Amino acid sequence: MRTNTTATVLLAAAVALLLATAARGDGGDGGCGKEDAAAGRDRARARGLKIAAFFSILVCGALGCGLPSLGRHVPALRPDGDVFFLVKAFAAGVILATGFIHILPDAFDNLTDDCLPAGGPWKEFPFAGFGAMVGAIGTLVVDTLATGYFTRALSKKDAATAAAVADEEKQSAAATQQHNHHHNHHVVGDGGGGGEEHEGQVHVHTHATHGHAHGSSALVAAVGEDDKETTLRHRVISQVLELGIVVHSVIIGISLGASQNPETIKPLVVALSFHQMFEGMGLGGCIVQAKFKVRSIVTMVLFFCLTTPVGIAVGVGISSVYNESSPTALVVEGILNSVAAGILIYMALVDLLAEDFMNPRVQSKGKLQLGINLAMLAGAGLMSMLAKWA
């Protein structure tokens, strides 16, 4: 899993570099959109708001991502508790609305913008919808291939362990039989009738214990195997979900950091803080269920919390050359947004909502089933309302 974290870091760096390079305005762009952008410019006020956004988004992301981990200390928030299902459903609704309401419309706007060349293909084909479809299908492929790969690797490891245990049991059984054979001969030599009775007792006791041990081992092995597969599934889900979040978080951060209009930044600070917190709740829930080691948990949480703030810092650094209305920037941002939307929509519907909604615990409790439906609608509704400001 460390390889996946490294890949996520490299992806974030590549997205930031790509946007920074693509957003440089050049003479061929005709200064499209620069007049509107210059209307409310105020560098001093904008800088203060960006600093506030940096820390606000960082803290809210940490709070959201850390909330599910409180289950270790608060019984109500344990992964197998009803409250945890409600929190995850709410967060999944937020992620679903993020894909449908926030990111996908932005992708359509970018790829149909008036600043794009009139003779280009961008207005003749719905590239934003196509990108979302590719993102969803790509996530499905990665999801299934990764799960299959790690499941096969786990099965091979378990098979090797089982073979080693079987060999050890055979050797132990052979040693026990040899010991019993020697002991029985010694007893028979001391007295005929008593020796036969004692030998029978040893024989019955050995087989009863042997059968009991094998029955318990089989039960423990079956439960352990199921738990391993579930944990493995959650690990794949958390890694893929973080990949989708990273792509659009970098874009959001760079766009906010490059803006010089305080009236544009001000509502974004509040909206993105809530957005980061709710999204963090969804990711944090997956991380807790994945049962990562402490080092991996800290790495994933820190990376999630820092992605948007670092994007803001990058945006501030390139603000003097950044032109979000340049054709190249519009195309790159639109494609990345559409793919990110497809990833998040797939993850929310398939890996988060469908999995929890079909969970036997939820299916057996009518009130919990109603509760997670309402929680999902609340999360999607609140995130949709934020689209008015962000």
From Swiss-Prot:
The keyword Plastid does not apply. Residues 72-82, 146-235, 289-296, 351-369 are cytoplasmic. Residues 1-25 form the signal peptide. Residues 26-50, 104-124, 257-267, 318-329 are extracellular. The chain crosses the membrane at residues 51-71, 83-103, 125-145, 236-256, 268-288, 297-317, 330-350, 370-390. One of its GO terms (biological process) is zinc ion transport. It is found in: Cell membrane. Keywords: Cell membrane, Glycoprotein, Ion transport, Membrane, Signal, Transmembrane, Transmembrane helix, Transport, Zinc, Zinc transport. The keyword Metal-binding does not apply. GO terms for cellular component: plasma membrane. It is a multi-pass membrane protein. Residues 165-199 are annotated as: Disordered. Induction: By zinc deficiency in roots and shoots. Plants overexpressing ZIP8 show decreased zinc concentration in shoots and mature seeds, increased concentration in roots, and are shorter than wild-type plants when grown in field. Belongs to the ZIP transporter (TC 2.A.5) family. Zinc transporter that may mediate zinc uptake from the rhizosphere and may be responsible for the translocation of zinc within the plant. NCBIfam families: zip. This is Zinc transporter 8. It comes from Oryza sativa subsp. japonica (Rice). The lineage of its organism: Eukaryota, Viridiplantae, Streptophyta, Embryophyta, Tracheophyta.
